[in-house]
């Protein structure tokens, strides 16, 4: 049985998904989505403890996918952190408006990413207790 927390990494760049997976997988089970539509479906079906969401993705962008996850009864409590190369303040504000709890810009420090994943994945556990 796998007792690891699940983190969904949604990014259209395979190398980013693999990099994040390498960083997180010793402590977390990592699920992958290559576009926003896939991210919404996986979040609904797998109920991850955290979603790391890119903004610029095909099918559904990260904002729209974040909004869809946060406005669905099954997935509304899943914390979402935007993981993106778009670092403008307006993008941060829009991410918060869509329901994201954190904003991580690329390039990122692997230790910082792991720390943020630990912190934000535990948000769901704390609210579920």
Residue map of PLM features:
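C-terminal output helix
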Residues: 108-117
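Short hydrophobic/Thr-rich beta-strand motif most characteristic of the beta2 strand and flanking loop
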Residues: 28-34, 42, 104
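Active-site beta3 strand of CheY-like receiver
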Residues: 46-52
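Two-component/phosphorelay signaling modules centered on CheY-like receiver
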Residues: 14-31
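Receiver (REC) domain active-site loop signature in two-component systems and cognate sites
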Residues: 57
């Amino acid at each position: 049985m796998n007792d690891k927390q699940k983190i969904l990494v949604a990014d259209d760049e395979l190398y980013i998904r693999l990099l994040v997976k390498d960083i997180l997988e010793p402590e977390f089970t990592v699920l992958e989505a290559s576009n926003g539509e896939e991210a919404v479906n996986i979040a609904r079906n797998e109920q991850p403890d955290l979603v790391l969401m890119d903004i610029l993705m095909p099918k559904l962008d990260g904002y729209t996918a974040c909004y869809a996850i946060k406005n669905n009864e099954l997935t509304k409590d899943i914390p979402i952190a935007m993981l993106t190369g778009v670092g403008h303040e307006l993008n941060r504000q829009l991410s918060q408006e869509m329901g994201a709890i954190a904003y991580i810009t690329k390039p990122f420090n692997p230790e910082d990413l792991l720390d943020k994943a630990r912190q934000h994945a535990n948000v769901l556990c704390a609210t579920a207790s």
